[in-house]
Amino acid sequence: MESSSVDESTTSTGSICETPAITPAKKSSVGNLYRMGSGSSVVLDSENGVEAESRKLPSSKYKGVVPQPNGRWGAQIYEKHQRVWLGTFNEEDEAARAYDVAVHRFRRRDAVTNFKDVKMDEDEVDFLNSHSKSEIVDMLRKHTYNEELEQSKRRRNGNGNMTRTLLTSGLSNDGVSTTGFRSAEALFEKAVTPSDVGKLNRLVIPKHHAEKHFPLPSSNVSVKGVLLNFEDVNGKVWRFRYSYWNSSQSYVLTKGWSRFVKEKNLRAGDVVSFSRSNGQDQQLYIGWKSRSGSDLDAGRVLRLFGVNISPESSRNDVVGNKRVNDTEMLSLVCSKKQRIFHAS
């Protein structure tokens, strides 16, 4: 199992639109990047002042590339009149290629690239479209874009589809496989607590599971954290920072976790499951199911009084900004129907 770590000091939760700064020459972050599963996270390294210094240096022949006082080259792109820093590179053409990748993601059909003879294949286009702008910027800044692209291509079969096979059983009432993939080894499950899905924006991993399945390379890395990729049953990749907190002596998933909680509508008592592929890539997977543990088929929908009553609707129906369950919704529908009956 591989792993990847990135200095936490380069990470913030701000916008991706940041202004680069003068920094002393240093080695590429690739050398310090460990990988666990297929890890990554959004890293925002705000640097200020490079633009002023760059004006004193010869300009680049490439679009979106600026010279650095230390002899290296920076790449940048503008989004809504704000500059997005794409990273620093040893070679001018490396920075130009990073700009080309970003402009494809930001401008799509309107992209004007430096290397017009280089055409993206369908796999790369799909890869770009399946990741947010901030995720692509993150990969470029950490010089992991090419590696993650190749990993994505290896997970595809000859038809260009993800090579995953759902289990024929084990579907939760959210329509999601709790174990994920037939070729995957189930690692462990955890019922999330109120604090796991609350404002702390972190998931505590039980210590014995953390040390067995997600061992950190060293104490130094434990503090900085490693970057993990988990793929869900829909093929979406979730990026979490995983580290050890000395203050609470616990292993936690932090950055990226709150987005997962929000999208999957997790509540206290719901169960998240983790598994790993048996293949050479050791891909990590994440699944989830509601606390009810119902074995209802997600495709089975009861239609009553013109309303679809299903597990999904029970979790998402909102009336007057208040979430209601199936029973409450049915009561509302019946009362409305009764009023209409008497009126006629």
Swiss-Prot record:
| Main location class | nucleus
Protein localization:
Nucleus
A Pfam family of this chain: AP2
Q: Which residues bind DNA?
A: 61-116, 188-292
User: Which InterPro entries does the entry mention?
Assistant: AP2/ERF_dom (IPR001471), AP2/ERF_dom_sf (IPR036955), B3_DNA-bd (IPR003340), DNA-bd_dom_sf (IPR016177), DNA-bd_pseudobarrel_sf (IPR015300), LEC2-like (IPR044800)
Induction, as annotated:
Down-regulated by brassinosteroid and zeatin.
Q: Where is the composition biased (Low complexity)?
A: 1-15
Tissues in which the protein is found: Expressed in all tissues examined: Roots, rosette leaves, cauline leaves, inflorescence stems, flowers and siliques. Highest expression in roots and rosette leaves. Very low expression in flowers.
Instruction: Give me the ranges of the annotated region Disordered.
Output: 1-22, 148-169
Q: Which GO terms describe its molecular function?
A: DNA binding; DNA-binding transcription factor activity; transcription cis-regulatory region binding
- What are the annotated GO cellular component locations? nucleus
Q: Which UniProt keywords apply?
A: DNA-binding, Ethylene signaling pathway, Nucleus, Transcription, Transcription regulation
Q: Coiled-coil segments, which residues?
A: none
Q: Which GO terms are recorded in the biological process aspect for this UniProt protein?
A: cellular response to hypoxia; ethylene-activated signaling pathway; lateral root development; leaf development; negative regulation of DNA-templated transcription; negative regulation of flower development; response to brassinosteroid
**Family the entry assigns:** Belongs to the AP2/ERF transcription factor family. RAV subfamily.
Describe the protein's quaternary organization and the partners it interacts with: Monomer.
Q: Which PANTHER family match?
A: AP2_ERF AND B3 DOMAIN-CONTAINING TRANSCRIPTION FACTOR RAV1 (PTHR31140:SF76), B3 DOMAIN-CONTAINING TRANSCRIPTION FACTOR ABI3 (PTHR31140)
Query: What role does it play?
Result: Binds specifically to bipartite recognition sequences composed of two unrelated motifs, 5'-CAACA-3' and 5'-CACCTG-3'. May function as negative regulator of plant growth and development.
Q: What is known of its domains?
A: Contains two distinct DNA-binding domains. One is located in the N-terminal region and binds to the 5'-CAACA-3' motif. The second is located in the C-terminal region and binds to the 5'-CACCTG-3' motif.
Identification of the protein by name: AP2/ERF and B3 domain-containing transcription factor RAV1
Organism, scientific name: Arabidopsis thaliana
Task: Point out the gene that encodes the protein.
Answer: RAV1
